[in-house]
Amino acid sequence: MDITVLNKKGEPVTNLTKDDFQVLEDGQPQSIDTLKLIEANGSAPEDDMSLEIRSPAHAAAEAARDDVRVFVIFWDEYHIGQMLPATRAREALSNFVQTAFGPTDLVAVMDQLTPTDAIRFTRDRRELADQVHQLKGRQGVYLPARSAMEEAQLYRGPGIEFVRAQVTASALEATINYLGSLKEGRKSILLVSSTIGPLGPSAA
């Protein structure tokens, strides 16, 4: 169970013990066996010599650490306009990825068609910015198709936007499940979209 305690100034309270908490399940008090303080602010420990991610296995090992924050930037290309909206979103996101994260934060960029086994985490801010510059907005744009799945969408006619919304919801759900498999504790998905429309049953 993750707990964040702040004082009146919005500052973290770090000197609490398990006796300061009460956990209830169905109204019944539960015993607290352990309480662990985790400070994950993206700063690099003085003895941390493994900032560069060398492989997916190394990324998974780093992601499992309690003091490492994990972020996925989900670019919703189906609901971002091709021209000005995409340009503005890329500019804002490029600045964001180069300034918002700490040296130990793990960050990945993906879209609807990125399989979870192709998600790649990095700490290289320039690499992230380069990935962002390659992102495209495809709202209302159906050709060329990027995959066989998208080719099949073309036969849905007026229902194609609903199908795209369902694909978005399914991809988000798969990403949530994937992040949950990395470790206990908090992970973050940053959704970049103009609107995700009617998500359909996958969003329930």
Locate the predicted segments by residue.
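Scaffold/interface architecture of coatomer-like assemblies
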Residues: 1-204
